[in-house]
């Protein structure tokens, strides 16, 4: 069995370990069952989750067994990590709906056949848990003084941390304990912001079961400026094609900064590292070839080869002056908006957030209509602006294209 840890370190996944050398030895000597938790606070995964999915896929390819822990129980409380305000509490019905949606999405990335991976919902043991028993069984092993120093609580302490959220660390630690007890799960993986919660599980297993457990955090997907990637003007970059079209998904990666190409190729694709370094070393206009490869590979993983090819062809057609518009996002206006100003139309279709932003873009030459730069704020859209295929083509900035249709 290959040791995957060196690969994870080389590709930039591994960040912190409870026991690095022991973890390396463990992964080289046995098939390890490990887990990553996902809270079902939405009905789709987004790019922030994709790092975790890639991490699981790489571990699975190396012969280890993933447990996908869906936090149906912990979602009733809400994770305070990285938040300055208390999260909206979801109903059981909302959580159950989201759990089903996430299960379907994850099956595209992880092989669940023949017990090669397991999906478990922590509602199984948390929802029926007797509170007094939980305090006696779990709470006795946690020091409040130590918990208050945890990074995950610091941002919330000034505004006020509810007792509900304060329990989250105990619940996550209990998750690891239950998975260790039932499935011999020896390792938890997660984002670097979960470090305190992960240590809690390692310590709980040691105290209650007198067994060794391990934790490793992965780097969060950030750009060269340290900001989280995966945010667009429309919000999060979703893995669900209904929420973020394959074309928009492709274009996001096609347009990343030059400085982020190597990191993204390394963490978000299965390309060999020699090829990653070769592509990342390209300069000037040549780096766009690397971005095209990045966009294609990531879109293929998330949406399949057919959708990736469609997005690639549409992107090439647009940037090369071609006419293939099949995968360009389409927005519509009612017929009674004909003769409205270009700014009214762009705001209505959400191509721009406001007229003020639209005026700024027009002044800077950042809006084109059918390849003609818009220079008049009050230009009126008419039927003459729509081609034989029934759409008008708007470009915002250098690379954002939209088809406007009537209907």
Swiss-Prot record:
Catalytic activity: tRNA(Tyr) + L-tyrosine + ATP = L-tyrosyl-tRNA(Tyr) + AMP + diphosphate + H(+)
S4 RNA-binding domain location: 340-406
Keywords: Aminoacyl-tRNA synthetase, ATP-binding, Cytoplasm, Ligase, Nucleotide-binding, Protein biosynthesis, RNA-binding
Main localization (coarse): cytoplasm
Superkingdom of this protein's organism: Bacteria
Compartment(s) of residence: Cytoplasm
Binding site for L-tyrosine: 35, 168, 172
PANTHER family membership: TYROSINE--TRNA LIGASE, MITOCHONDRIAL, TYROSYL-TRNA SYNTHETASE
HAMAP family to which the protein is assigned, alphabetical: Tyr_tRNA_synth_type1 (MF_02006)
Summary of subunit composition and partner proteins: Homodimer.
Known role: Catalyzes the attachment of tyrosine to tRNA(Tyr) in a two-step reaction: tyrosine is first activated by ATP to form Tyr-AMP and then transferred to the acceptor end of tRNA(Tyr).
Name the record gives this protein: Tyrosine--tRNA ligase 1
Source organism of the structure: Clostridium acetobutylicum (strain ATCC 824 / DSM 792 / JCM 1419 / IAM 19013 / LMG 5710 / NBRC 13948 / NRRL B-527 / VKM B-1787 / 2291 / W)
